[in-house]
Amino acid sequence: MKKFLFLLIFIFSLSFSEEISQNNDLDFLDENYLVEEVQKDNFETLSIIQGKKIEAVDPAQIKDNYSKRVLPLIYQTLFSFDDEGKTVPNLVEKYRWLNGRELYLQLKNGVYFHNNEELKAVDVKNSLEYIKENGTLREIFTEMSDIKILNDAELVIKFEEEDNTFLEILTSRITAIVKREDEKIYGTGKYLIKSFDNNSLVLEKFKKYEENDVYPENIVFSWEIQDSQRFISLFNEEAQIICDVDKRALEYGKKYGILTEENIIKEDRDLKTLALTFGNQRNYTREMKKAIESIIPREATSFFPKEVCESSFSKIDVSIDEKKSTELIEKSNLRKHIKLTILNTEKHSREAEEIKKVMKSYGIEVEILPHNVESYNQKIEEGDYEIALFTIPLAKGGILFNIAKIFMSDLENIEIYNSLSPFLKKLKEECERENREIIEDKILQLIYSEMPYIPISHFRDYTVVSPDLREIFYEWEKK
């Protein structure tokens, strides 16, 4: 009864407390440290609840991190990163550059798709060519000119120009190798897709996977947008793992006894940027954007997090100068009424209220427009808003991949991406890492000067694991 009372207090506080709101890749699943260690007799089915819906399971068509999270369980990539961040072969047995424009690959033997057909060179060719023609990020494959099959296990990828970033690109989950037959898609990973609908994704262990002792038998992914509801599911033992937990919600969970020392709390590896983006309903000049930037409270001192790119030229000043801000507002003729579109979550509501409060002190009224997931996603995709709070996921695969993902997929701003072509070409041609970092920083400086969005903060969410998995978790930690 006492624990139940704590839960009610927690949910009430999370939703209505003035402190919270005055009126949000399963890293460990990548590393297998829970999945492979869970004993079958204890956890035949592992239940995971994340913050948003899985929209697609075709790697080439995925745009969001919530869908991307499940990819390592179903598919494999040609290359991956080791613990030190170096690019290493994955589905590839051997590789070498024949020259600056030809990459030789020899595939591993004994790798099977979920339809029980063995992986062959033609499957790699078909996958990469599909991405180039139909993929969400097809622009990053424009330099790939041809793929020559030598035999079932060997092939050569040819390029129009030198591309020293291509191996990094092939580590990305969206470049996973798949087999497409009619409307079906098969991977080579630990789990195959048992069912997928609007409510859940159910995965089943693939018997022919090279490591056949993977447990549990099934993994069920479902989704719930509100942190509080995911906590309830964990509390009621309806899930063993909840993802995408906001730091503030985590603190309140601890404060009210919903989370205890028995829970495992893991900070996600993947970074996100909370940003203020600009839609098509009104034309905001660069001067207007700079005026807004000078007003709102921000933590991001760089356009990308330092973990993605060390900033020198692209540092951002987050200090507040009221006199300067007032001058920028007057000079830019910034409107006195702004409509702010948000996703109807505790995190977005809290951030929106903070923006509204500070803007009001400068005589600017902010109308907050909350939307459910479907409506919000449609607004963002179509640019049908004035300004919006938007969470931009940042992926492994280097700055080139992130730039392509943000401007070709997340924000669909092809003009900015095309304007960077000379610098991106130079980045692909540069071999020395130090020189590439200088080019990367300069690219970010150029992007930021165009103000495509205002980065408010860079952050990581958290994953919370049930105490039932505690022993399994710590056994992995010892390894």
Model-predicted regions and their roles:
Residues I49-N99, E129, Y186:
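N-terminal lobe/hinge region of extracytoplasmic solute-binding protein
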Residues L26-D30, K289-I316, K347-E354, I380-K479:
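Detector for C-terminal structural segments
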Residues F4, E162-V214, N218, Q226-Q229, ...:
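Gly/Pro-rich hinge or "lid" segments in bacterial periplasmic/extracellular proteins
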Residues K94-T136, V156, Y284:
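Aromatic- and charge-enriched surface segment that lines or borders ligand/interaction sites
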Residues R96, G100, E139-R180, K190:
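Surface-exposed binding/hinge segments that line
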Residues K208-Y252:
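Ligand-site clamp/hinge motif
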Residues K52-K68, L91, E117, F166-I174, ...:
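A structural "hinge/loop" feature
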Residues I329-L394:
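Ligand/substrate-recognition segments at binding pockets and active sites
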